[in-house]
Amino acid sequence: MKFRPLHDRVVVRRLNAEEKTAGGIIIPDTAKEKPMEGEVIAVGPGARNEAGAVVALDVKAGDRILFGKWSGTEVKIDGEELLIMKESDIMGIIEGTASKKKAA
């Protein structure tokens, strides 16, 4: 099944939470919080402004984003847990993550 969001909605896949702390302590599943970081899978065409013109979204598929703890609606599409949220629920785009992983 292919899903295409409408208006200013965005489909997000949560990124896995860290298994260990910086000090090397392993975090058990029961103590983990849901991650507030994700990857944009699909975006809608945008919302309409007062003049009726479609305003494109700032995020695009593949962007790594940060969102609020209670943002979005959890759905299951093709057996995968995803979130559908409005663009306004997104706090920002995380840039430069590839270089961060290389340095670690």
From Swiss-Prot:
The lineage of its organism: Bacteria, Pseudomonadati, Pseudomonadota, Alphaproteobacteria, Acetobacterales. The gene is groES. GO terms for biological process: chaperone cofactor-dependent protein refolding. GO terms for molecular function: ATP binding; metal ion binding; protein folding chaperone; protein-folding chaperone binding; unfolded protein binding. NCBIfam families: PRK00364.1-2, PRK00364.1-5, PRK00364.2-2, PRK00364.2-4, PRK00364.2-5. InterPro entries: Chaperonin_GroES, Chaperonin_GroES_sf, Chaprnonin_Cpn10_CS, GroES-like_sf. CDD domains: cpn10. The keyword Cytoplasm applies. Gene3D superfamilies: GroES chaperonin. Disulfide bonds: none annotated. Heptamer of 7 subunits arranged in a ring. Interacts with the chaperonin GroEL. Keywords: Chaperone, Cytoplasm. This is Co-chaperonin GroES. It comes from Acidiphilium cryptum (strain JF-5). The keyword Transferase does not apply. Belongs to the GroES chaperonin family. GO terms for cellular component: cytoplasm. It is found in: Cytoplasm.
